[in-house]
Amino acid sequence: MDVEERLKLVTRNAVEVVTEEELRQLLEEKEEPVAYVGFEPSGKVHLGHKLVIDKMIDLQEAGFHVIILLADLHAYLNEKGTLEEVRELADYNRRCFLAMGLDPNKTEFVLGSEFQLDEDYALDVYRMARHTTMRRARRSMDMIARSEENPPVSQVVYPLMQALDIVHLNVDLAVGGLEQRKIHMLARDVLPKLGYDSPTCLHTPIIHGLDGDEKMSSSKNNFIAVDDEPEVIREKLRKAYCPAREAEGNPILEIYRYFIFREYDEVTIERPEKYGGDVTYTSYEELERDFVDGELHPLDLKENAAGYLSEILKPVRKAVSAPS
């Protein structure tokens, strides 16, 4: 795989790379660069997580070594539970992520508290605090913070630590959903002041909640868990927001775009003959066009999405139900 092929794979379904020139140079200079993403072990693993894990799988196929940070201290700072509770969830996260298709030989799982309590790391937190305003630290947490009103000081420490994770894990590429962008830009601006390189960052889309909310979240109960049973998936999708002829912010269409067409070269929408019969698509764009034109009914999209998604998530259900 040449550099152009690797670049195309890395940027597939990404919202942005900061910067693409840096990414290209990285691919030209390193056969096995290191990419990382961090997750708070809290609540259910859902399609929002899978969207990012799928990108890490792309990165592995493009030659990257992948680090998955199970950010127990971050979850604690963000009021997601006690340290004991979030650490118990870390193994559940690991099993789900591997079952989604990560190559175990190219994946390194790191618990945040394994290195974030070290003296050098702590000193860097203090150094970074000297170069970061309170306003900027708070602003970087806009789409992440658990408490938006009267937040605790811990939510100011959080983005400083996330920026420092990049250098203390020796990462070449920092990956995250678009909600992480402000923290990554903070890292790019401030880390050079501490003598570190400005990190290259890649951002994935934010999938909408099933209720049409701007973000799928376990705390809002508007999600498909990756270990949901088929009948649960079907019931959730039947109730999901899917306005006829509207593509913008439509979670059902996003499921087709980011998950179903990723796994299938052809997607067949099965429906009764009196409503036009079965129709097969070879690209997401064709399906979206027909939906916007009124050729596809929301219920037909939902029913067929449930079948495809249940099959895609089958390995995860099997892994989670097996003894740990």
UniProtKB/Swiss-Prot annotation:
<feature type="binding site">
    <location>
        <position position="162"/>
    </location>
    <ligand>
        <name>L-tyrosine</name>
    </ligand>
</feature>
<feature type="binding site">
    <location>
        <position position="218"/>
    </location>
    <ligand>
        <name>ATP</name>
    </ligand>
</feature>
<keyword id="KW-0436">Ligase</keyword>
<dbReference type="InterPro" id="IPR014729">
    <property type="entry name" value="Rossmann-like_a/b/a_fold"/>
</dbReference>
<dbReference type="InterPro" id="IPR050489">
    <property type="entry name" value="Tyr-tRNA_synthase"/>
</dbReference>
<dbReference type="InterPro" id="IPR023617">
    <property type="entry name" value="Tyr-tRNA-ligase_arc/euk-type"/>
</dbReference>
<dbReference type="InterPro" id="IPR002307">
    <property type="entry name" value="Tyr-tRNA-ligase"/>
</dbReference>
<comment type="subunit">
    <text>Homodimer.</text>
</comment>
<dbReference type="InterPro" id="IPR002305">
    <property type="entry name" value="aa-tRNA-synth_Ic"/>
</dbReference>
<feature type="binding site">
    <location>
        <position position="165"/>
    </location>
    <ligand>
        <name>L-tyrosine</name>
    </ligand>
</feature>
<feature type="binding site">
    <location>
        <position position="36"/>
    </location>
    <ligand>
        <name>L-tyrosine</name>
    </ligand>
</feature>
<keyword id="KW-0963">Cytoplasm</keyword>
<keyword id="KW-0030">Aminoacyl-tRNA synthetase</keyword>
<feature type="binding site">
    <location>
        <position position="158"/>
    </location>
    <ligand>
        <name>L-tyrosine</name>
    </ligand>
</feature>
<keyword id="KW-0067">ATP-binding</keyword>
<dbReference type="GO" id="GO:0006437">
    <property type="term" value="P:tyrosyl-tRNA aminoacylation"/>
</dbReference>
<keyword id="KW-0547">Nucleotide-binding</keyword>
<comment type="similarity">
    <text>Belongs to the class-I aminoacyl-tRNA synthetase family. TyrS type 3 subfamily.</text>
</comment>
<keyword id="KW-0648">Protein biosynthesis</keyword>
<dbReference type="Pfam" id="PF00579">
    <property type="entry name" value="tRNA-synt_1b"/>
</dbReference>
<protein>
    <recommendedName>
        <fullName>Tyrosine--tRNA ligase</fullName>
        <ecNumber>6.1.1.1</ecNumber>
    </recommendedName>
</protein>
<dbReference type="GO" id="GO:0004831">
    <property type="term" value="F:tyrosine-tRNA ligase activity"/>
</dbReference>
<comment type="function">
    <text>Catalyzes the attachment of tyrosine to tRNA(Tyr) in a two-step reaction: tyrosine is first activated by ATP to form Tyr-AMP and then transferred to the acceptor end of tRNA(Tyr).</text>
</comment>
<feature type="binding site">
    <location>
        <position position="180"/>
    </location>
    <ligand>
        <name>L-tyrosine</name>
    </ligand>
</feature>
<feature type="short sequence motif" description="'KMSKS' region">
    <location>
        <begin position="215"/>
        <end position="219"/>
    </location>
</feature>
<feature type="short sequence motif" description="'HIGH' region">
    <location>
        <begin position="41"/>
        <end position="49"/>
    </location>
</feature>
<dbReference type="GO" id="GO:0005524">
    <property type="term" value="F:ATP binding"/>
</dbReference>
<dbReference type="GO" id="GO:0005737">
    <property type="term" value="C:cytoplasm"/>
</dbReference>
<dbReference type="InterPro" id="IPR023684">
    <property type="entry name" value="Tyr-tRNA-ligase_3"/>
</dbReference>
